[in-house]
Amino acid sequence: MPSTGLDKKPDSGATDLAALDTHLIAPPGVARRVFEQLRAPAEGAGFEIVRVRFGVQDGQTLQIMAERPDGSMTVEDCAELSRMLSALLDVEDPIPGEYHLEISSAGIDRPLTRPKDFERWSGFEVKVGLSEPLSGRKRFRGILQGVEDDEVLVECDIEGFSEPQVLGLPFRQLSEAKLVMSDDLIRESLKRQGPVNDDPDAPADGE
């Protein structure tokens, strides 16, 4: 599918999306270190880590979003993963001092962090932020059209065009991306996943 080339810089070469698979999952620092330590054990237990965040406001907190390969994540799954990761973190000890561990599903209006997320949820509305402006903008909202080469395709309204345009947003420049809550998204999420913990603020807690 063609995309507009508004204010795009020349590409320095093809980008391997597999190498970009972590920059939205876990930023450099504690979160990235934790992700790299826990990714393989989590996958071995049948889970995929969607996002890792570490914050220090109101005490140190480690937040991990995860799901099964089919996108499902029950309350029981959260509890199981919390027990497993708590034990691993006690051994690896990647965070100095005391901290609070929170395990949750990605929720319905979920963050999109991996190339396959953008393919899986093609056709639904998204909000995307960029680290660098494209055509003078850093934020876009439109209908996700999947991934092509090293770009995420989003159909959105652009000033100067009478019809919505499909923009190619460089994956390496994405700073955030998430689905927009809608009735269609709720129905599709329930259809695909079955019962799901759709409240990321109601995590399974660990020590």
Swiss-Prot record:
Pfam families: DUF150_C (PF17384), RimP_N (PF02576). It is found in: Cytoplasm. Its main location: cytoplasm. InterPro entries: Ribosome_maturation_RimP, RimP_C, RimP_C_sf, RimP_N, RimP_N_sf. Keywords: Cytoplasm, Ribosome biogenesis. Belongs to the RimP family. This is Ribosome maturation factor RimP. The keyword Cytoplasm applies. GO terms for biological process: ribosomal small subunit assembly; translation. Gene3D superfamilies: Ribosome maturation factor RimP, C-terminal domain, RimP-like superfamily, N-terminal. Required for maturation of 30S ribosomal subunits. Coiled coil: none annotated. GO terms for cellular component: cytosol. The keyword Metal-binding does not apply.
